[in-house]
């Protein structure tokens, strides 16, 4: 299983990686500070889970999620955001993510999202 974590904040990115490693110790967890680098990786190697920041105001995370969904329609997407739930709800829900977290999410909440993915991972 490959989990791709994307956040432009190094501390948050490290936290996402640590929690992904806890949830799936056997997974290949890749980290990226930009949507562009993450997309380059996914185009070459694919991924099963995309754990990404929405990243206003440019909404790079939504753009990335749309592109990754075209590559793998059954990719599990978990959005992480500083936004309130309503700010980007329509755009987020159109992508049918596996989860949605705020940046204040606890390790337990992140683990719960990773353990309740929409699409099963082999």
Positions of predicted regions on the chain:
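Conserved acidic segment of CheY-like receiver
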Residues: 1-11, 16-17, 50
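Acidic, metal-coordinating helix/loop segments flanking the phosphotransfer/catalytic sites
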Residues: 31-49
């Amino acid at each position: 299983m490959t989990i791709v974590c994307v956040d432009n904040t190094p501390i948050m990115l490290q936290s996402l990686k640590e929690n992904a490693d806890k949830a799936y110790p056997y997974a290949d967890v890749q980290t990226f500070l930009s949507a562009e680098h993450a997309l380059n990786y996914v185009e070459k190697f694919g991924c099963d889970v995309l754990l990404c920041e929405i990243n206003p105001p440019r909404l790079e995370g939504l753009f990335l999620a749309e592109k990754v969904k075209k590559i793998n329609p059954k990719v599990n997407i978990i959005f992480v955001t500083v936004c309130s739930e309503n700010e980007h709800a329509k755009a987020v829900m159109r992508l049918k993510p596996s989860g949605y977290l705020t940046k204040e999410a606890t390790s337990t909440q992140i683990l719960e999202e990773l353990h309740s993915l929409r699409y099963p991972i082999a």
